[in-house]
Amino acid sequence: MSEPAVVSILDTDLYKLTMLQAVLEHYPDAQVSYKYTNRSPKMALNQEAYNWLREQIRGLRNLHLLPEEEQWLRKNCPYLKESFYEFMHEFEFDPENSISLNYDSETKDLSIFIHGLWKNTIFYEIPLLALVSESYFKFVDKDWSPEGQFEKAYEKGKRLIRAGCAFTDFGTRRRRDPHTQEIVLQGLMKAQEDFKGPGSFLGTSNVYFAAKYNLNVSGTVAHEWYMGIAAITQNYKQANRIASLKWVQTFGTSLLIALTDTFSTDVFLKSFTANSADDLANVFHGVRQDSGCAEEYIEKVVKHYKSIGVDPSTKVIVHSDALNVDRCIELYKYCEKCGIKSAFGIGTNLTSDFQKVSNPSEVSKPMNIVIKLFSAEGTKAVKISDDIMKNTGDRDAVIQAKHQLCLPIA
């Protein structure tokens, strides 16, 4: 067998751990499924890449939470409860029974379907996406080099810090390989060491690298949480509120950044109220913007906070949609002008930003791949988002959800 590319069960995003905690508390017996989609279909695996991917996925069964990893989590993630560790002591990946993996050697279509108990399958998404990306750039597109990645990351960090941006690495899922992500983090750490404010490198969403380099680990919540609850309850009008309340019940005053666009931000804000029984707008520290026009989003959120008597200057918008350094700086300035704090979760632009070796003036394009919740408790799951191109799920289920929410179908 080839060397494992994923060497730790913690080589994933923090929100997978926190969502597992919430699932254990609220939906321990829920059955779910997930589906892989390649939004860059011309970037397809060859047979060699698929063979390597299949072997790597099988190897996930060898990963377990190590004692030193548990020790680090207990110290640095106090919001994870004893029930989380009790579960993790027994947990192991079971790819043979949880994953349907198929590859058509003629069309080069790759199919990945994950199924099982939510608590047993929630950890697959991030390593599988990282492995698909790595397999493509290991065996199909080899016209790139890690040379210069440290310097590139250092320069990005310098510009962001000098501009006032507070930012985090969100790049695990679409990285070229783990080595690239590690080099990038080293470059960002060096920039943080060399340049003092007004911005700052806040750390990474990757738990393994946070532990390895003693970085802050950060994360919000994924669309998966809202999508799953909406499918389970079949109540799209109340899904955001139910999901938010259960999140608060689980974590209290920690990890309170709300993701607003699962069923559109307009729908979310209807249940994001203040001075009511829920008081969610006061309780949550801020919101995350992940689709649509960011400037319109900033204005909308600031206006909403003001309309319900919440001072927007006490809140933060975490931007995470297709960011690069220039875009972060633009949005930082726009948030500042509108009177709200900002932070940035930068993914692909950090861990898959390359030029072609054969023609350095040409970009080596990253893959655009996702794994999304497909169903929960037998009901199709959907994501509507603030961008029509980011709608996810069975078309009939999307139409049904939009009818419930009084959203335009087209």
Swiss-Prot record:
Q: Which residues belong to the signal peptide in this entry?
A: none
Reaction equation(s) it catalyzes: nicotinate + 5-phospho-alpha-D-ribose 1-diphosphate + ATP + H2O = nicotinate beta-D-ribonucleotide + ADP + phosphate + diphosphate
CDD domains the record matches: PncB_like
Q: How cofactor binds (record note)?
A: Activity is highest with Mn(2+).
The protein's required cofactors: Mg(2+); Mn(2+)
| Gene Ontology biological process | NAD biosynthetic process via the salvage pathway; nicotinate nucleotide salvage
A single GO CC term for this protein reads:
cytosol
The source's domain of life comes to Eukaryota
Q: Which UniProt keywords apply?
A: Ligase, Magnesium, Manganese, Metal-binding, Phosphoprotein, Pyridine nucleotide biosynthesis, Transferase
Q: Entry's PANTHER family?
A: NICOTINATE PHOSPHORIBOSYLTRANSFERASE
NCBIfam families from the UniProt entry: NAPRTase, PRK05321.1
Of which family is this protein a member? Belongs to the NAPRTase family.
This chain belongs to which protein, by name? Answer: Probable nicotinate phosphoribosyltransferase
- Which organism is the protein's source? Schizosaccharomyces pombe (strain 972 / ATCC 24843)
